[in-house]
A protein has these predicted regions:
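Conserved G1/Walker A P-loop phosphate-binding module
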Residues: 1-120, 126, 133, 144, ...
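C-terminal-of-GTPase-core extension/linker across diverse P-loop GTPases
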Residues: 2-6, 11, 17, 145, ...
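Short, conserved glycine- and acidic-residue-centered signature motifs
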Residues: 81, 137, 221
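Amphipathic alpha-helical coiled-coil segments with heptad-repeat character
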Residues: 85, 122, 129, 134, ...
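Substrate-engagement module of ASCE P-loop NTPases
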Residues: 94, 135, 140, 230-235
Length: 369
């Protein structure tokens, strides 16, 4: 899974990236301090995998990973190449989802890059969101218009498929031209057609509302957070309150020291853990587990994935030669204390090609090639 972290300059984007990846990207109070995308691979926290590793003491423990990409800041006009716009748009196109960092706290010492320099607004999360959204929408509008024109030309041959495609992209063009994102377009039965266009404003989005420590402790009283939450609810997006500077402090701690610090703050889990969970939920992802003395490993798949395709995540030969999946639910294994005890209680299931893998399934694949 690849998540692109975006945001206007000076909203805390690189600070958050540094905190969650410990990648040390330069963070400075001026635009474009992140010129090339910084990439950080982060292990997905999974207590189930930790427990299996504790039980089996394998040679290797391999968690699922999330790739975070800190994408260069942009300004108004990016879709026309202003600022670092072209780089921004190309880099974001390669991601599975967008984490849009928006500043939700006042600080007169932080320079705010506004879309219109004549408007002296110190903090304007909705305006910041609109600035980036419009650049994505304008880039998509160019694509939609080209698709409509191409389909219209091909439709002259009398092919009804292209006539329909031209109509769909003409409707989409009008929708985008009105300043609305592709996410809010009613594609109906044409969703697959629209998805194939790889539109930027169609990507799932998480608004990371960056708060200062006071705002994080008193979220209900933060008017900026409430504005972002209301927008996210209307769009069907996710909102994640986070304090980037606090996350930096948390990232420097480990083990019991980290847990004690979180407890002192009254936080159950770090912002990174919450962001990963939010991302999994947004993208409809789950994990299954493989286990043994050589390796215990978590694998990420989409909800609804059938057993052979899940096996293909491990190796294409296993998918090609799939015979069956021997499955134990993790919760059943914990309930009975071990895999062998769960087997004795009849909890080992033999599943075929149509089995839909569930979150937390512990699987051994039988195959022959």
């Amino acid at each position: 899974m690849k998540l692109g972290i975006v945001g206007l300059p000076n909203v805390g984007k690189s600070t958050l990236f540094n905190a969650i990846t410990n990648a040390g990207a330069e963070s400075a109070n001026y635009p474009f301090c992140t010129i090339e995308p910084n990439v950080g691979m982060v292990a997905v926290p999974d207590e189930r995998l930790d427990k299996l590793a504790e039980m089996y003491q394998p040679k290797k423990k391999t968690p699922a990973v999330v790739e975070f990409v800190d994408i260069a800041g942009l300004v108004k006009g990016a879709s026309q190449g202003a600022g670092l716009g072209n780089k921004f748009l190309e880099n974001i196109r390669r991601t599975d989802a967008i984490v849009h960092v928006v500043r939700c706290f006042d600080d007169e010492n932080i320079m705010h890059v506004v879309a219109d320099a004549s408007t002296n607004v110190p903090v304007d999360p909705l305006g910041d969101i609109e600035t980036i959204d419009l650049e994505l929408i304008m880039a998509d509008l160019e694509i939609a218009r080209r698709r409509a024109e191409k389909a219209a030309k091909l439709a002259k041959s009398g092919d009804k498929k292209f006539l329909h495609e031209a109509e769909v992209f003409q409707r989409l063009s009008a929708h985008l031209d009105a300043g609305k994102s592709a996410r809010t377009f009613d594609a109906g039965e044409d969703a697959e057609l629209i998805n194939g266009a790889e539109l930027l404003s169609l990507k799932p989005i998480i608004y990371a509302a960056n708060l200062d420590e006071d705002g994080f402790a008193n979220q209900e009283g933060n008017k900026y957070l409430q504005q972002v939450a209301e927008l996210a609810a209307r769009e069907g997006a996710q909102v994640l309150p986070i304090c980037a500077k606090l996350e930096q402090d948390i990232a420097e701690l480990e083990g019991e020291e980290k847990q004690m610090f979180l407890e002192e703050l009254g936080i159950a889990e770090s912002g990174l853990d919450r962001l990963i969970k939010c991302s999994y939920s947004l993208l409809g992802l789950i994990s299954f587990l493989t286990y043994g003395e050589d390796e215990c490993r978590a694998w990420t798949i989409r909800k609804g994935t059938k057993a052979p395709q899940a096996a293909g995540k491990i190796h294409s030969d296993i998918e090609r030669g799939f015979i069956r999946a021997e499955v134990i639910a993790y919760d059943d294994m914990i309930k009975y204390g071990s895999v062998n005890a769960a087997k004795e209680k009849g909890q080992l299931r033999s599943e075929g090609k149509e089995y839909v893998v569930q979150d937390g399934d512990m699987i051994y694949f039988r195959f022959n090639v």
